[in-house]
A protein has these predicted regions:
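Compositionally biased terminal segments of proteins
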Residues: 1-166
C-alpha cells in the first residue's frame, strides 16, 4: 500500500522544502510494523518561519494536485512571498486537502520548540521512495498527548511515556 503523503514529500524534496513530520502521524513511523499504530486523520508538517520555504511548500502542494486552505476559505492568490510573509507574521496554518480525504497541516509553530533546534536532530524515514524528515529521538511534539518516542537501537524503537497521565 502506498502512503498518501509520499507524493507530496517527493515534491517537497524536489523543491528543497525544509519540514518535519510531527504529531500522531510522525510517531507512527517509529512503531514497528507488527505493532498497532495510532489512528489519525491528518499529517502535520512543521515548517520554519521562512517565506521562501513556505512558498516552495505551497508550490509542491499545487504540483501534486492538492488544494490549499486558510481556515474554511481557499488560500488567497497570488501565492507569493508577500502572502507567505503575512501567513508567517500571523503564524497561520495552511490546511492542504486532496483525494481520499488526505489532510495535511503546514504548521509554523510547535509549542516549546523552535524549528532550527528540532531540525538539527531530525531523523529521515524512507516511505515509498520519499524521504520524510522527523524530529530525532528524544524530541516529542507537545502539541499532542502522545508519549515521546525513543530509538534504543537501529532496529528496536520503543515507546517511553513522560507522564503518568498516559
Amino acid at each position: 500500500m502506498t502512503s498518501p503523503i509520499a507524493p507530496l514529500c517527493r515534491a517537497l524534496a524536489e523543491r528543497s522544502v525544509r519540514y518535519l513530520l510531527i504529531g500522531v502521524s510522525g510517531a507512527n513511523f517509529y512503531i514497528p510494523p507488527s505493532w498497532p499504530s495510532f489512528v489519525t486523520l491528518d499529517y502535520d508538517l512543521y515548517l520554519p518561519p521562512d517565506a521562501n520555504n513556505l512558498l516552495r511548500a505551497w508550490e509542491a502542494c499545487e504540483q501534486t494536485g492538492l488544494d490549499l486552505w486558510l481556515r474554511d476559505e481557499p488560500l488567497d492568490r497570488p501565492r507569493d512571498v508577500g502572502l507567505a510573509e503575512q501567513m508567517i507574521a500571523r503564524l497561520a496554518l495552511t490546511r492542504v486537502t486532496g483525494p481520499d480525504d488526505l489532510t495535511v497541516d503546514l504548521a509554523l509553530v510547535m509549542k516549546g520548540l523552535d524549528f532550527e533546534t528540532v531540525w538539527k536532530e531530525r531523523r529521515p524515514f524512507i516511505i515509498d521512495g520519499a524521504e520524510i524528515p522527523q524530529p530525532g529521538s528524544g524530541i516529542s511534539s507537545s502539541r499532542s498527548t502522545l508519549p515521546a518516542v525513543t530509538r534504543t537501537s537501529c532496529f528496536s524503537p520503543r515507546i517511553e511515556t513522560r507522564s503518568s497521565s498516559w
